[in-house]
Amino acid sequence: MFVDIAKIYVKAGDGGDGIVAFRREKYVPAGGPAGGDGGKGGDVIFVADRELNTLLDFKYKRHYKAQNGERGGPNNMHGKDGEDLIIKVPVGTVIKDAETGEIIADLSREGDRAIVAHGGRGGRGNAHFATATRQVPRFAEVGEKGDELWVILELKVLADVGLIGYPNVGKSTFLSVATNARPEIANYPFTTKYPNLGIVYISEGESFVLADIPGLIEGASEGAGLGHQFLRHVERTKVLIHIVDVSGSEGREPVEDFIKINEELKKYSPELAQKPQIVAANKMDLPDAQAYFELFKEEIEKMGYEVYPISAATGMGIREVLKRAYELLKQQKAAENIEEDAKPRTFVYYKKKDVKPLTVRKENGVYVVEGTVVEKVARNIVLNDHDSFRYFQNFLNKLGVFDKLREMGIQDGDIVRILDVEFEYYE
């Protein structure tokens, strides 16, 4: 089964907690704090692998989580970092943030990497909180949470040349004759529901990848038929072979079909419509095809396109079309200065997080303090003794929280809440 789109959840590892510990050595009577820091959580990293050609695995498994960092140890021992989670995807995979639609990375080269979720920082051990006036801190930080998000994976087939045209015009037959591919072929529309790939050999050392893309219909740019699936794959190709049935056997109007498909390409992407395009007038082996062809050729050449008469059923004219496609492909690669041995790239994504300003409001008699900075500290410090609470109070004072509370008329004994932390206020 060919699967070319998937939605999955990824979660980076949480940071390990810092710990509270003190040196316990025989000849060191006042060893001081020695709690180690927690390890960093593992990242979630996507890697492009040319051995894969479908997103099928993600149909059955949709949740992925990297390893958490380990707790710190005594004697200032740093906790072990969590292992990164490597997720392999086919070359040609585009990764998007499912919430915003933002493109995170386009993994179009073998070995391309995308770090999409970052592991949480490890919490600091109590050794970090020792000061001249707080020589025996009995508190530490917990590790930060790792990033989490839903992402959409879209596979865009990496073919050099794409076969386009209305359903049932002979694209699959053309592919089977031109390559060793064995696509499903039948006399009804949308036989091809997924891209079929084959290798075209022009001569020794000269070849290209040819894709039979699912049939396109009017309205495809708005998603009709297999529209968006079709157009997503066409984006990757550098040259298009537009196959048109000129026999009239299906009761269609060849020139009208040609114009409509190019209109759909342009609606979806103006760049797509500018790709070099060879027109292959198919089914020339059928009766009356020659008469239709002469009229068709005259109209299409007026638009500036090259037209080749072919018969996918007999093989007539196909070699000439393939040679011309290869010539155009070489020109495109030279113009784009594409390096076949281009080095892999690394994409790094940081999901934008809302930064909340410091605010204080009164709700049901409780003073509620909110803000990104103050909430981060409240989340990371375990407030379980006098030392930790004193540290937290000093932080709030420096941040200006107490000044805001006084401005609002707070009285001794009133309750203050930050996240799930509540305490009584006293001057």
From Swiss-Prot:
Annotated binding of Mg(2+), by residue: S172, T192
Domain Obg: 1-158
EC number: 3.6.5.-
Residue ranges occupied by any OCT domain in the UniProt entry: 347-427
Subcellular location, principal: cytoplasm
Gene3D superfamilies (UniProt xref): GTP-binding protein OBG, C-terminal domain (3.30.300.350), GTP1/OBG domain (2.70.210.12), P-loop containing nucleotide triphosphate hydrolases (3.40.50.300)
Gene Ontology biological process terms, A to Z: ribosome biogenesis
Localization (cell): Cytoplasm
Cofactor(s) demanded: Mg(2+)
Physiological role: An essential GTPase which binds GTP, GDP and possibly (p)ppGpp with moderate affinity, with high nucleotide exchange rates and a fairly low GTP hydrolysis rate. Plays a role in control of the cell cycle, stress response, ribosome biogenesis and in those bacteria that undergo differentiation, in morphogenesis control.
Name of the protein this chain belongs to: GTPase Obg
Species of origin: Caldicellulosiruptor saccharolyticus (strain ATCC 43494 / DSM 8903 / Tp8T 6331)
Gene name tied to this protein: obg
